[in-house]
């Protein structure tokens, strides 16, 4: 509608989902943040399907949200909500907790592999310097806690990957590269961090990550990074 004083008014007839945002995200595909530069500055994902797929493949999933002094709760069974999101108490905390049980009807094994989780948590801690990640395994008789925190970020990541490899030395036996080379920059809203180090090996190992997702086959992101470097 065009109004006086050069104003324009736009109104749609969107019916709304008639359910909480939490339930929409957990039960509908493509409900993610897409390409928002703030939401996806460091997080992975693209099509908004991740957590809704986890829910769909779970026999049971519980979602707890601590926000604005309240604790919210909603429970799902086989991907469907058992009841709407509700307030179950007060909370001084902030954040979200998801507890899920994979479906035995879909997966041949629903046992989690701690070694895979440890490797992934370590990667995330390296890629997000300063963040602390705790992995607590109480599935066994004796509880085991692994803590990951690396203030050096990708620079420390390269040192970790290189620590057991043969060093490149001169004829006097001195290491030629005691520290990894570190490069960082920002161009056109794209941030780049790079660390590299030479050793005595004859082939390179490249570990490219985009928004914390390992791209083992390289691709455009790696190519553009090498061009800018």
Positions of the model-derived regions?
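Conserved catalytic core of Hanks-type protein kinase domains
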Residues: 28-29
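Single conserved hydrophobic/aromatic residue that forms the stacking wall/gate
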Residues: 1-6, 10, 227-228
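GHKL-type ATPase core
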Residues: 11-21, 32-160
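Short basic (Lys/Arg) and small-residue
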Residues: 25
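Short, well-ordered strand-loop elements centered on a beta-strand within folded domains, enriched
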Residues: 4, 73-74, 81-86, 203-211
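GHKL/Histidine-kinase-like ATPase module
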Residues: 115, 122-124, 130, 134-227
């Amino acid at each position: 509608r065009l109004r006086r004083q050069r104003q324009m008014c736009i109104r749609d007839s969107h019916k709304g989902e008639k359910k909480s945002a939490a339930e929409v995200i957990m039960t509908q595909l493509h409900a993610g943040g897409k390409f928002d530069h703030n939401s996806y500055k460091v997080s992975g994902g693209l099509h908004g399907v991740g957590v809704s797929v986890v829910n769909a493949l779970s026999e049971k999933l519980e979602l707890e949200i601590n926000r604005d002094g309240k604790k919210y709760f909603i429970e799902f069974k086989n991907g469907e909500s058992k009841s709407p999101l509700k307030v179950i108490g007060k909370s001084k905390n902030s954040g979200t907790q998801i507890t899920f049980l994979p479906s035995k009807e879909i997966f041949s094994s629903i046992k989690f592999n701690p070694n895979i989780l440890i490797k992934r948590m370590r990667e995330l801690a390296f890629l997000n310097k300063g963040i602390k990640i705790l992995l607590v395994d109480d599935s066994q008789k004796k509880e085991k806690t692994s803590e990951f925190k690396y203030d050096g970020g990708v620079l420390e990541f390269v040192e970790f990957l290189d620590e057991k490899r043969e060093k490149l030395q001169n004829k006097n036996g001195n290491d030629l590269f005691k520290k990894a080379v570190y490069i960082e920059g920002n161009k056109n809203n794209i941030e780049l961090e790079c660390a590299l180090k030479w050793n005595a090996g004859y082939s390179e190992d490249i570990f490219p990550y985009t928004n914390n997702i390992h791209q083992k086959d390289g691709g455009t992101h790696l190519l553009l990074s090498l061009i800018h470097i």
